[in-house]
């Protein structure tokens, strides 16, 4: 009973409640794809992207990255240059994917009620700016050289077909729903198990005595400079490795509340400043397991993949720490 109600329903249900927002995002991306506009945007952006060491072709994968990192990384296969392809793969995860929207929505509603839209837009801009900075660093270090000339056949403009848009939309939304009932489903069960039992596999009455608490408490000091050291918060970040949507569902399970009341529960674990630091960290830290697996497949190198994960975690920690520490001084 506890597994079904407190684990599965609380976890998967809280994630599915954000499906309308995510479907809306995918709907507009699908329209842009079907009209032939994407290719023209790539052509227009070529001159600008060359300043940071990329070609216009890199723009399309990074734009898709705002929907999901997995198809975005796979889309880099269309890039002719191996240099451009690898560089685009490294930068794409900095484009905030739709799976992070539930996290932004919950925290913005709880801590930035008057400025929800501004904070969310600010997060997206932060990701883009960080991506540009990282690109400039890579351009002058590991990826010296010039991007290949831009050559692309531009398709004719056309009115979007309802059938084509519907198929594109379903393909993208289906992936989100499948993850909710597979990756997030199993992640929720694992989190429930770790929260319910202690090291001796005895059922605990207080979740602070659970296996999950031990893991969260072990890593929580790392996040103290960022303003959040609550084991429930750090544990939710661990679950975020399985799927970013799982961060919200894990918090809902650990705080024994529903998504609707999660904002109230979060006020006891965060200040406004630490909430902003958490959002910045969540924006920038390593993408989900599916995206990491795709990076491994495209780069064909475990060492480079591990390097990408470590680099993103370090960038996220440094930026989150800067936000909290500088904010505390003001």
Positions of PLM-derived features:
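Selected transmembrane alpha-helices and immediately adjacent juxtamembrane segments
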Residues: 1-31, 118-233, 237, 306-330
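Conserved phosphate-handling catalytic cores of large alpha/beta enzymes
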Residues: 71-149, 252
């Amino acid at each position: 009973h506890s597994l079904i109600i407190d684990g599965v329903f609380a976890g998967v249900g809280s994630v599915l409640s954000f499906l309308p927002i995510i479907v809306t995002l995918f709907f507009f991306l699908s329209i842009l794809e079907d009209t032939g506009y994407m290719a023209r945007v790539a052509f227009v952006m070529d001159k600008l992207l060359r300043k940071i060491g990329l070609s216009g072709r890199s723009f399309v994968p990074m734009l898709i990255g705002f929907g999901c990192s997995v198809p975005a990384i796979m889309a880099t296969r269309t890039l002719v240059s191996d240099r451009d392809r690898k560089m685009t793969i490294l930068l794409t995860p900095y484009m905030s994917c739709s799976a992070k929207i539930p996290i932004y929505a919950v925290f913005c509603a709880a801590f930035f009620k008057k400025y929800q839209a501004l904070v969310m837009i600010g997060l997206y801009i932060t990701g883009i700016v960080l991506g540009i900075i990282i690109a400039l660093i890579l351009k002058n270090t590991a990826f010296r050289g010039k991007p290949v000339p831009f050559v692309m056949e531009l398709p004719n403009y056309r009115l979007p077909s309802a059938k084509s848009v519907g198929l594109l939309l379903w393909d993208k939304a289906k992936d989100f729903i499948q993850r909710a009932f597979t990756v997030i489903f199993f992640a929720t069960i694992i989190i429930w198990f770790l929260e319910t039992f202690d090291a001796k596999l005895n059922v605990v009455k207080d979740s602070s005595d659970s296996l999950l608490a031990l893991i969260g408490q072990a890593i929580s000091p790392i996040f103290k400079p960022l303003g959040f050291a609550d084991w429930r918060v750090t544990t939710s970040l661990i679950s975020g490795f399985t799927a970013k949507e799982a961060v919200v569902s894990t918090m809902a399970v650990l705080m024994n509340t529903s998504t609707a009341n999660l904002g109230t529960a979060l006020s006891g674990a965060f200040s406004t400043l630490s909430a902003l630091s958490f959002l910045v960290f969540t924006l920038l830290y390593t993408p989900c397991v599916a995206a990491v697996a795709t990076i491994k497949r495209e780069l064909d190198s475990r060492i480079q993949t591990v390097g990408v994960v470590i680099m993103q975690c370090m960038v996220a920690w440094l930026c989150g720490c800067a936000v909290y520490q500088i904010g505390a001084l003001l």
